[in-house]
Amino acid sequence: MITRFAPSPTGYLHVGNVRTALICWLYVRKQKGKFLLRFDDTDTQRSQEEYIKEIENDLKWLNMNWDASFRQSSRFDRYEDVFQYLLKEGFLYPCYESKEELEFKRKMKLKSGLPPIYDRSALNLTQAEKDKYFGRAPYFRFKINQDQLINWDDEIRGKVSFNPKNISDPIIRRVDGTYTYMLPSVIDDMDFNVTHVIRGEDHISNTAVQIQMLDALKAKVPMFAHLSLLYSDDNKISKRVGGSSVKDMQLYELEPMAINSYFAKIGTSHPIDVHINMLGLINSFDITAFSQAPTKFNIDDILKLNPKILHNMSFDDVKDRLKELKIDKPAFWDFVCGNIEKFSDIEEWIKICSRDMVPVVKQDDKDFITLALNMFPQGEVHDSTWNTWVSNIKQQTDRRGKNLFAPLRLALTGLAAGPELAKLLPLIGREEIVRRLSYSVTQ
């Protein structure tokens, strides 16, 4: 099995791209197949090297690797060879209308209540009419066979039957000699033996045309799966919608696996479970579970998954990131992971565990904190120190529950809520504990 993800490097990856890439990746990895990364950069005016690098970096950040990659701009000679073959065999034909003439035809069709389908007038030009266009470079269309329905078994939509009379003969090559999406995509799928194509439902008419192109080239037709489109606030998600790029999600400080856990299940009947690695998503993936209904995207739903991902990560999962913060103690991660919503929240806990932390004590609690300081156990501070300390305090005071724990937490962390204090004490050590308690009662 071979599938491909084919972004255009004319901008950053957005959520629609991410979902398509992820589903392609999970699908082929579950079948032990190959994942190709193809850059559709035939639009040389808008394609940029910067975006190619950013797309590669974003996929790596999202834990999606690829087995091979290539750029369509490196294959223009191959496209030209196939173009000449199709032209010779009568599958392509030249057209001479200007953009203004085509737009006029489109408006007249709509005004007459007809679908704006190309009238194939270029097919019926006499030699005399062609001579009038002498000196004007043609563009080329693929001649669709309108005599039979185009059928395929879609892995999401089931049996699909498409009437070719409902679409225009697609433009294959522009006046300037550059290629549109259609033909290069077909040639690449043929040459790289792509067996499965997964993409959005907005490509269904493209699929119908490309099946005929593959037939014209006597090539094997791959399996197709067309995903429903993503919507947000009743608007189709696109590159132009603010807040929808991978870069935007990184600014939200979303974890890659929160994003992946969400997009692997959104649009299915399955619950969205958090997975801290890709293997769990691979094992639970089922392409037939995806619905044909439009799929609502809400970044707030990913935000809710983010803390769950962090809470379930082990020290080994984050040790490289912690190392950048000069933290090498698994006990620290065990202490904070259940109380952060985004990874950068760790910085607050680093401060709390350092000598920079300023204790807080209420006036009414000063005597109690003095007592607690005197009751603190002797010897090395370890995991059981907290329970021993609290037991000692209870023997000397009638404080219980919140009245006992809240003043200690404020004095030791400056916060009204947070992780277990039993885990904090070994991290800050006896000297710092005594300093904080002493500071609290002397201010």
UniProtKB/Swiss-Prot annotation:
Binding residues for ATP: 239
Any coiled-coil regions, as ranges: none
Short motif 'HIGH' region, span: 7-17
Key words, A-Z: Aminoacyl-tRNA synthetase, ATP-binding, Cytoplasm, Ligase, Nucleotide-binding, Protein biosynthesis
Class of the enzyme per the UniProt entry, highest EC level: ligase
GO MF entries: ATP binding; glutamate-tRNA ligase activity; tRNA binding
Broad class of the protein's primary localization: cytoplasm
Protein localization: Cytoplasm
Intervals of motif 'KMSKS' region: 236-240
GO biological process: glutamyl-tRNA aminoacylation
Catalytic activity: tRNA(Glu) + L-glutamate + ATP = L-glutamyl-tRNA(Glu) + AMP + diphosphate
InterPro entries in the cross-refs: aa-tRNA-synth_I_cd-bd (IPR045462), aa-tRNA-synth_I_codon-bd_sub2 (IPR020751), aa-tRNA-synth_I_CS (IPR001412), aa_tRNA-synth_I_cd-bd_sf (IPR008925), Glu-tRNA-ligase_bac/mito (IPR004527), Glu/Gln-tRNA-synth (IPR000924), Glu/Gln-tRNA-synth_Ib_cat-dom (IPR020058), GluQ/Sye (IPR049940)
GO cellular component: cytoplasm
Function of the protein: Catalyzes the attachment of glutamate to tRNA(Glu) in a two-step reaction: glutamate is first activated by ATP to form Glu-AMP and then transferred to the acceptor end of tRNA(Glu).
UniProt subunit comment: Monomer.
HAMAP family: Glu_tRNA_synth_type1
Protein name from the UniProt record: Glutamate--tRNA ligase 2
Source species: Ehrlichia canis (strain Jake)
